[in-house]
């Protein structure tokens, strides 16, 4: 049986870390040590990422899968999510409000309607797998994204392979282009930190609009792309630490 919820240690307030699309629980390994200072940390591998995907690739199905995985955690959690993980975090908070006491949401917005993942999926299908070495990964993707994928891909005898189906990743993203998640966001009533990179992938202004909800703080981090916590790890740590000191 594949282990999907990982106990990263620590004591006290449970803190759950949710990775982004095409990521894995391991992409948080550089943040876990300092986040552990604020509570009992758990990481999670989303369905479709190194394990079977739900039969229906809807956000609700992924949230249901997450809820099953964390059912044994009785105390309300601080949930920290990046990208897809951020969306799942606030949708989980909306459908299971008793399980969430605070949110940290990184570079994700409620409404991507009209966007398509078709070209992106075609590009992924053309990646030269397997990647024979760490250097090959970083040369192809760059140092930051290369490390992200090194932490996520399956390593086999002949190199590194994508840890899921391109069609799965495409369809997850395609759903975001057909609907919005403002209603789920408006259902949230816990303290929330919103973090957006200067070179964000989110539609302009949406995360600022999200911050109009009471109890929400918005921070835009300079010189950061979509992987804010890896592009600017020290600044990310500063703003998240400040927030955790107020809620944990």
Predicted features, each with a name:
Residues 81, 85, 89:
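Gly/Ala-rich beta-loop-alpha elbow adjacent to hydrolase catalytic centers
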Residues 191-224, 230:
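Conserved loop-alpha-helix segment in the C-terminal half of the alpha/beta-hydrolase fold
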Residues 118, 132-184:
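Conserved alpha/beta-hydrolase catalytic His-Asp/Glu region
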Residues 230-244:
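Post-His helix in hydrolase/transferase enzymes
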Residues 90, 94, 101-130:
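Flexible "cap/lid" loop of the alpha/beta hydrolase fold
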Residues 1-15, 36-40, 74-76, 101, ...:
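Alpha/beta-hydrolase fold catalytic core
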Residues 42-80, 238:
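Active-site loop/oxyanion-hole signature of alpha/beta-hydrolase fold enzymes
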Residues 7-51:
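Conserved HGGG/HGGXW glycine-rich cap/lid loop of the alpha/beta-hydrolase fold
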